[in-house]
Amino acid sequence: MSLENKNIIITAGGTGGHIYPALAIAELLRQNKANVTWVGTPNSMEASIVPEYFNIQFIKSSGVRRKGIIKKITFPLKLAYNTLKSRSLLKKLKADLVIGFGGYVSGPICLAAAQINIPVIIHEQNAKIGLTNRILAKFATTICLAFEIENLHKQFSSKQLAKTKIVGNPVRKDIVALNDKARIYTDSSTLKILVLGGSQGAKAINEIIPKLIQKSNEQGINIKVWHQTGKLSLEETKDAYKDISQNHIKDIAAFIDDMAIAYNWADLVICRAGALTVSECAIAGLPAIFIPLPSAVDDHQFFNVQNIVNNNAGFCLRQQQMTLENLLAIIKPLNQDRSKLEQMSKMAKKTLIKNSSEQILDCVKKILNNK
């Protein structure tokens, strides 16, 4: 069916892990002639990213997890107020359907939609269902998951399970295109490592990588690094590289504007295990050493990589295990036998769903066709 003149609301916010998958879907919906409006919170990451691409409306919203007792007491009142405001906004926008990608802003918008009989699709990017989506699952028309969730039958009712679909994480087209590229690892003596510290940086990773380059060089492993530090650690990390030859450095930057180019360049990635990074590495066929964020809610980053690790397509080190010795124990055999990297690349591509965006689009069309 055509989505022409259909008003679809995208709501996502807080982190890139929520925002970038939502952007991929929003773009596909626009290509299918839908009218797309984004709803986010002011003074947020989405407020700085989304306006370049889509019309964005703002509501105030905040979470309750790990907050003080006063905020926990007042939270229900704020949620009720924000939900009421969201109902007015959805009526004003003449919304036909709402898609929530998580973050606190999704709560009141999706609740409001359900209250006024607007269909709701929610998408969970992680291998552990977040608090907002656990609540919204009761009201959603369709529940989309990126990963198989352990013991899902204990978390969802039979009714919720019946409307649940595993679709993967939406990834930008230029990264999906890398899935068709066969990675060749035997034509260079240099091992190219892409280091991703995340948008806020990863201090522990940023500190150890320069030491890893030096130690590897001493052991005859020729590494070249492209290091994304995050905005908070750029100068400090650059200083740690000052005694390392430029021959071992591709670039050190707070951000990488074109991740497809970076993924295409790399042989191996060292990174956190956020859902989007995990999905992008797998779809691009990139072996990775994942270092889950220790403070991640419900340890979700650890669970995000279990399918990849179990299929021998990547490695997972807890942060306390991220020593020079353990990193070298992984890197040295891969450098000596590049066919291992090639095999991991092939396995990585098989671990995640390639056409996630199209599957979510299909959910949208089915719901609106039956509306």
From Swiss-Prot:
Pathway: Cell wall biogenesis; peptidoglycan biosynthesis. UDP-N-acetyl-alpha-D-glucosamine binds at T15, G16, G17, N126, R172, S199, I256, A275, L276, T277, V278, S279, E280, Q301. Its EC number is 2.4.1.227. It holds the Pfam family Glyco_tran_28_C. One of its GO terms (biological process) is peptidoglycan biosynthetic process. It comes from the Bacteria. It catalyses: di-trans,octa-cis-undecaprenyl diphospho-N-acetyl-alpha-D-muramoyl-L-alanyl-D-glutamyl-meso-2,6-diaminopimeloyl-D-alanyl-D-alanine + UDP-N-acetyl-alpha-D-glucosamine = di-trans,octa-cis-undecaprenyl diphospho-[N-acetyl-alpha-D-glucosaminyl-(1->4)]-N-acetyl-alpha-D-muramoyl-L-alanyl-D-glutamyl-meso-2,6-diaminopimeloyl-D-alanyl-D-alanine + UDP + H(+). GO terms for cellular component: plasma membrane. Its main location: membrane. GO terms for molecular function: UDP-N-acetyl-D-glucosamine:N-acetylmuramoyl-L-alanyl-D-glutamyl-meso-2,6-diaminopimelyl-D-alanyl-D-alanine-diphosphoundecaprenol 4-beta-N-acetylglucosaminlytransferase activity; undecaprenyldiphospho-muramoylpentapeptide beta-N-acetylglucosaminyltransferase activity. Keywords: Cell cycle, Cell division, Cell inner membrane, Cell membrane, Cell shape, Cell wall biogenesis/degradation, Glycosyltransferase, Membrane, Peptidoglycan synthesis, Transferase. Cell wall formation. Catalyzes the transfer of a GlcNAc subunit on undecaprenyl-pyrophosphoryl-MurNAc-pentapeptide (lipid intermediate I) to form undecaprenyl-pyrophosphoryl-MurNAc-(pentapeptide)GlcNAc (lipid intermediate II). This is UDP-N-acetylglucosamine--N-acetylmuramyl-(pentapeptide) pyrophosphoryl-undecaprenol N-acetylglucosamine transferase. It comes from Francisella tularensis subsp. mediasiatica (strain FSC147).
